[in-house]
């Protein structure tokens, strides 16, 4: 009995309202227990006063309930060691107890931090999408502007080219005597046109157009002389001084002798006929006859003029094309016809 009040002072909860159960006597016992162990020992008079009330009954019930709760709590810890503190709160009588658990506060703090992080993530995603859409819109506008500019320039160039061609055609119709803008050298072959070749031929000397092959003409000259000797042996025998001169002369033929075999058939026949009619009076007359029978360079030059074989513009571009000379001729014919009509 002596140890009971001390145990009650240390083990019982301070939430019990002793003034409600035992009144002033219980309050006195509680105060005496707080002061010192010797003074806290109750006397017989106080126990008699307390026994008359329900204070002991309430204390007994409280002790039994606390023992039962402790025993049940130990069993739950053995069977379920990972249970949370929420089950312990449900087992206790919450009417007279207030239990503060820090784990719920930590969970609440973690939930708040997670929500804040997710909000920041969503804000970043939305901002990135807005930025990408703005860049895409700017690029699309720039490309569309470039396309419109290119299209406008293309239309202007096309219209300008058609207008230029129309203007050129109208100018040709109004002024047919204007010189043809086609260059002298064609774009396909690079060769001069027929008219340009004629102009170049007139400007350049005709002697430059001669073709000479000295290595071949010696053979022709020997054959020609051998045939003449066979036909006219008297001429060959009556002119002995001319033979040494021919032997002493160099083997390279002269300009006129080199071009002799390329003469046409009419010229060769005339030369042989003139050589046959020459009489063998003297060597001087024979040499003069041979010189007279041989053609001169002036007579040979027109026969060896090489003309370039190049198609004209009329053959290339069709019969509708007219050169400058043809335009002038047609213009003169038109003027003559107009004058005849007026007369």
Swiss-Prot record:
Superkingdom, taxonomy of origin: Eukaryota
Primary location recorded for the protein, binned into one broad class: membrane
Annotated TM spans: 123-143
Motif PY-motif mapped to chain: 191-194
Subcellular location: Cell membrane
Signal peptide (UniProt feature, chain positions): none
One GO BP: axon guidance
Chain segments carrying region Disordered: 228-253, 323-343
Keywords linked to the UniProt accession: Cell membrane, Membrane, Transmembrane, Transmembrane helix
Bilayer topology annotation: Single-pass membrane protein
Gene Ontology cellular-component annotations: plasma membrane
Job of this protein: Essential for nerve cord development. Functions downstream of fra to control axon guidance across the central nervous system (CNS) midline.
Protein family: Belongs to the commissureless family.
Protein name: Protein commissureless 2
Species of the source: Drosophila melanogaster
């Amino acid at each position: 009995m002596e140890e009971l009040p001390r145990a009650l002072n240390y083990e019982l909860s301070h939430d019990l309202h002793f003034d409600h159960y035992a009144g002033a006597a219980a309050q006195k016992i509680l105060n005496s227990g707080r002061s010192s162990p010797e003074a806290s020992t109750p006397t017989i008079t106080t126990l008699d006063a307390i026994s008359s009330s329900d204070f002991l009954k309430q204390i007994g019930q409280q002790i039994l309930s606390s023992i039962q709760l402790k025993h049940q709590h130990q069993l739950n810890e053995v069977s379920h060691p990972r249970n949370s503190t929420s089950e312990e709160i449900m087992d206790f009588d919450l009417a007279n107890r207030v239990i503060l658990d820090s784990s719920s506060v930590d969970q609440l703090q973690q939930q708040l931090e997670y929500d804040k992080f997710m909000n920041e993530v969503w804000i970043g995603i939305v901002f990135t999408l807005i930025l990408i859409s703005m860049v895409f819109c700017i690029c699309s506008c720039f490309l569309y502007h470039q396309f419109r500019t290119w299209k406008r320039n293309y239309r202007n160039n096309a219209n300008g080219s058609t207008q230029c061609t129309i203007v050129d055609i109208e100018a040709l119709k109004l002024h047919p005597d204007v010189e043809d803008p086609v260059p002298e050298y064609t774009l396909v072959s690079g060769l001069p046109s027929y008219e340009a070749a004629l102009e170049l031929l007139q400007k350049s000397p005709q002697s430059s157009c001669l073709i000479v092959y000295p290595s071949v003409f010696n053979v022709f000259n020997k054959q020609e002389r051998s045939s003449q000797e066979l036909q006219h042996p008297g001429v060959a025998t009556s002119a002995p001084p001319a033979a040494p001169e021919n032997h002493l002369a160099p083997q390279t033929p002269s300009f006129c002798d080199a071009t002799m075999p390329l003469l046409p058939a009419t010229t060769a026949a005339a030369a042989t006929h003139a050589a046959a009619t020459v009489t063998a009076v003297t060597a001087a007359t024979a040499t003069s006859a041979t010189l007279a029978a041989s053609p001169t360079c002036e007579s040979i030059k027109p026969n060896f003029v090489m003309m370039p074989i190049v198609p004209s513009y009329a053959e290339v571009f069709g019969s509708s094309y007219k050169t400058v000379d043809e335009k002038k001729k047609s213009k003169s014919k038109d003027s003559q016809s107009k004058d005849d009509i007026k007369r």
